[in-house]
């Protein structure tokens, strides 16, 4: 799964996330019939006390959705994906420091709590 997410993030990072006034990136997750789907959106606003900021979509890169077949339960998937995304973001910070350096980054299920990872 990590390689699949790494490849997806590499493709997404080719869009100009850093040039759009985006202050926060949200990796959303929802369940599908065969597993889960990840997507990325960006917002020009962020509020640490109100997760509704993630609903303010000011940026959606092309190739935004990644379907992942999985038999994990939602908690296990969330924990695994959160760690993988954090690792991938840290790796991309080395190769493209401007990409995520000034961004809030969070992961969450569409109808659940959001976890800030950066």
Where are these regions (language model features)?
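Amphipathic, interaction-prone secondary-structure segments
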Residues: 14-50
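Acidic, proline/glycine-rich low-complexity IDRs
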Residues: 3-18, 46-51, 57, 63-68, ...
């Amino acid at each position: 799964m990590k390689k699949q997410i790494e490849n997806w993030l590499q493709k997404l990072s080719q869009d100009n996330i850093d040039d759009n006034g985006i202050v926060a990136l949200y990796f959303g997750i929802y369940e599908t019939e065969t597993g889960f789907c990840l997507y990325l959106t960006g917002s020009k606003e962020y509020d640490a006390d109100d997760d509704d900021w993630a609903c303010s979509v000011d940026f959606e890169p092309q190739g935004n959705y990644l379907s992942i077949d999985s038999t994990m339960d939602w908690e296990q998937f969330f924990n695994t994906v959160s760690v993988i995304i954090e690792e991938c973001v840290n790796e991309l910070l080395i190769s493209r420091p401007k990409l995520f350096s000034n961004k809030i980054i969070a992961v969450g299920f569409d109808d659940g709590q959001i976890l800030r990872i950066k």
